[in-house]
């Protein structure tokens, strides 16, 4: 079973997404955070338990790429999916340059989100 870490500041979205992932037979949410500070603590405490991180970009106390930078600086190769409402023509390239593996809009379907997660867990870009 793949263990997922969620960083999302909107509680209702984070809880709904965690519930969705928890209903999948191959996925388990092992940590959740609603802010960059909380995410840094959770990631440090549970680094060995995380198989994939789903990271929101725009947070009340920073940008999700700061957590990605921290993970990469610590030598983590855990795949990272940025799931955001932000838009921009160069956003995918930018988040990848910051260490993320893929970017997906929060407007994506549930099937697209689950497919992207499973693709990244298999070691490929979505």
Region locations from a protein language model:
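Active-site residues of response regulator receiver
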Residues: 56-57, 84
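C-terminal output helix
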Residues: 90, 108-121, 125
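The feature encodes the CheY-like receiver
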Residues: 60, 88
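Acidic, metal-coordinating helix/loop segments flanking the phosphotransfer/catalytic sites
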Residues: 32-52
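Short amphipathic alpha-helix used as the core "switch/output" element in two-component signaling
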Residues: 65-76
């Amino acid at each position: 079973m793949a263990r997922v870490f969620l960083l999302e500041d909107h509680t209702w979205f984070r809880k709904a997404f965690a519930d969705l992932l928890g209903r999948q037979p191959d996925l388990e949410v092992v940590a959740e955070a609603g802010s960059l500070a909380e995410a840094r603590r959770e990631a440090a405490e549970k680094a060995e338990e995380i198989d994939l991180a789903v990271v929101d970009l725009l947070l009340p106390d920073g940008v999700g790429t700061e957590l990605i930078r921290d993970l990469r600086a610590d030598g983590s190769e855990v795949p990272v999916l940025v799931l955001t409402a932000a838009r921009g023509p160069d956003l995918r390239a930018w988040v990848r340059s910051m260490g993320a593996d893929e970017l997906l809009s929060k407007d994506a379907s549930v099937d697209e989100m689950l497919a992207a997660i499973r693709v990244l867990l298999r070691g490929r870009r979505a």
